[in-house]
């Protein structure tokens, strides 16, 4: 795919955005009242639902840890989530690696020492995939954990960025992901510390830092929206206490 199919002479992308524009980001918390925690993320056409269960007794006893909780992550990708056959049938190995990355990331963020010999289960349902799925899974997990009342050290906020020739792009859609070098970056909302980064395909070292900084800037935008959603969801509870 040529440069001009990704970014026109007028500086517009195939979905009408400029290089530094994000897609519309919306999030809802507590949409499944019967669950311990839940959150729904929409980033453009990408849609992810997260359900959190626990802390509870570990399903597999051997995974119980004497000094902290064990975080189990499962990702389910709906068969109708994308029209791209290659993406629809992505390998189980890739999904397992994504689950492991999410587990490692959130075991560092959750105050796991408060729940020894227990398990927190995170179930992610990718309902529609139009790019930035891993980022959306991370953002949805953060909100669902907060909704479940599980203590976390900070928000984990995530976004993507890529490069076409020497032009950087923020928040790639599915078409852009299939054609460009890009990365996913997650940071702690308050201190902007990078806690997760995944590079997809090769990228020239001269551009890596700039692309990473763009993804971090996108994560800051995500953080502000997520903070507002949490405050909004907490209003009824706070009102009942007054």
Curated annotation (Swiss-Prot):
CDD domains: RNase_PH_RRP41. Keywords: Cytoplasm, Exosome, Nucleus, RNA-binding, rRNA processing. InterPro entries: ExoRNase_PH_dom1 (IPR001247), ExoRNase_PH_dom2 (IPR015847), ExoRNase_PH_dom2_sf (IPR036345), PNPase/RNase_PH_dom_sf (IPR027408), Ribosomal_Su5_D2-typ_SF (IPR020568), RNase_PH (IPR050080). GO terms for cellular component: chromatin; cytoplasmic exosome (RNase complex); cytosol; exosome (RNase complex); nuclear exosome (RNase complex); nucleolus; nucleus. It is found in: Cytoplasm; Nucleus, Nucleolus. Belongs to the RNase PH family. Non-catalytic component of the RNA exosome complex which has 3'->5' exoribonuclease activity and participates in a multitude of cellular RNA processing and degradation events. In the nucleus, the RNA exosome complex is involved in proper maturation of stable RNA species such as rRNA, snRNA and snoRNA, in the elimination of RNA processing by-products and non-coding 'pervasive' transcripts, such as antisense RNA species and cryptic unstable transcripts (CUTs), and of mRNAs with processing defects, thereby limiting or excluding their export to the cytoplasm. This is Exosome complex component ski6. It comes from Schizosaccharomyces pombe (strain 972 / ATCC 24843) (Fission yeast).
